[in-house]
Amino acid sequence: MMTFTELLKNRRAIRDFQDKELPLKIVEEILQESTLAPSASNGQPCRFSIVNCKDTIKALSDESKENLLDDYAKNKTSLNPGYVDVLKDKNFNVFYNAPCLIFVIGSTAVHSLELDCALAASYIMFSAASRGLGTCWIALGAYIRDPQMKALLGIPDGCEIVAPIIIGYPKEIPAASERHAPQILRVIS
């Protein structure tokens, strides 16, 4: 079994997966572990939608790309210029054709929602890595607005997607990228 430090050092963002189904039971175990993440005032505001249908994942990708490009054209969001051409490519799937997609969702009325969901998302990614699975938080995949798609995902009014996470069996685990030393601004003793 991996130590916690080994887990921290070995987790990677994975965007290339084996064409292998991820059992729902494993995803449910991972989500159960994610509920152990801390949240403000122990509010536990995170909810989850699981998508393991490739056609639906592709449709969600297309919806997100369309909304992102529309927002970009209307100056509602900034994008790295390199992303614009990629998003216009009909064959590009923002979810990288992953076998499974987890949306971390919560109520917009919760003041700490983004922080709480980010903590749950990190627990998802570490739980998956401990099982030899790969994950990646796909920020470009959060732009789902179509009411039918939101209904399909079970997202009620007043809730939003915070963290779309792809998950599956990695084709390979890339080498670690260089990490900077922590920038400690000050120590007050």
Q: How should these model regions be labeled?
A:
Residues 1-21, 26-29, 33:
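N-terminal targeting/leader regions
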Residues 6-10, 14, 88-89, 161-189:
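C-terminal helix-cap and adjacent tail motif
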Residues 17, 110-114, 174:
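A generic structural signal for short coil/turn motifs at secondary-structure boundaries
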Residues 34, 102, 106-152:
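Small-aliphatic-rich amphipathic alpha-helix that forms the alpha element of a beta-alpha
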Residues 38-42:
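Glycine-rich phosphate/pyrophosphate-binding beta-alpha loops
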Residues 68-77, 152-177:
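A glycine-rich helix N-cap at a beta->alpha junction
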Residues 99-101, 135, 160-162:
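Structural motif
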